Amino acid sequence: MADSSLVGGGEEPEERVIEAALRPKNLHDFVGQHRVRKQLSLVLEASRMRGRSADHVLLSGPPGLGKTTLSMIIAAEMNAPLRISSGPAIQHAGDLAAILSSLSEGEVLFLDEIHRMSRPAEEMLYMAMEDFRVDIVVGKGAGATAIPLELPPFTLVGATTRAGLLPGPLRDRFGFTGHLEFYSVEELELVLRRSAGLLDLKVNSAGFSEIAGRSRGTPRIANRLLRRVRDWALVHGIEQIDARTASAALDMYEVDKRGLDRLDRSVLEALITKFGGGPVGLSTLAIAVGEEPETVETVAEPYLVREGLLGRTPRGRIAMAPAWTHLGYAVPEGVFGQEALALFEVEDLGVEPVAEWLPNGQ
């Protein structure tokens, strides 16, 4: 069975240690995200010139694109200590109050998955971000008293994969908001070149290209695949990694040319061979591949939808034309994805509906 964490979200403790060692330490070394990097550099430089803490920063985007790394870089660029916590760890206002009250002046507080913080903690954070003050409630009922607690100036860096779940009042309190985009293959090759240098690996250009092409546009995955290829080359006594070596290693781990892993291909295979390309409901599809519906929806579907291999419709999931081609099947007439108009719903096109899922309304 394939290592399901290879292109997924899970990381072993040892992997996290290695990943941390590969992180760039300043904006100059950070590859990609040119727009966000340029804007953030200006914000930090202006803050240093004023001799004040930087504005609060909100970073959004898919996992693995560098939100945590950028928080560390912000602290390093401001020559400030960094405190790391996460939304799920702050379920009560008291949890947040304890963290805020222990911050030193200028410290950077990084809150990962900030959208998962509890509502009482969010409301306390409003005042802390705007006025650098929180009210600590002592006692209960009619005898409860709010004691104001002054906080030193600090910089909050929030990270989220679901910016739409953040309340408007919280989003509005961030002075800078940056959205991280998926990386191009060329940018991932630059990431891999830097990592290979730090790991003292010999990789040629074709090897970098092969790994980058299977990395789903995500640096975290690219670095993970590089380490697995390194292991394969070490065991097989290969000194320089080329395209053939990288391909053989990643084929063994069941990561194909488009970055699809075992689960991704199982979902598409089931859609095509068991349900004729769909539509089929999520629960039924999950049973067909032997996984939980949540796993299919959160692990496999985002990448498959982004690549145009799977479609989500009101009636269920469907295999798009490129999925049939990628798995080596002939594309039946009328399968979505063959024409640009097939990407839109009938209501979007403003035309009369035809018989559902049949070509030319037949």
From Swiss-Prot:
DNA binds at residues 312, 317. ATP binds at residues 22-23, 64, 67-69, 130-132, 173, 183, 220. GO terms for biological process: DNA recombination; DNA repair. Residues 1-183 are annotated as: Large ATPase domain (RuvB-L). GO terms for cellular component: cytoplasm; Holliday junction resolvase complex. It catalyses: ATP + H2O = ADP + phosphate + H(+). Residues 257-362 are annotated as: Head domain (RuvB-H). This is Holliday junction branch migration complex subunit RuvB. The gene is ruvB.
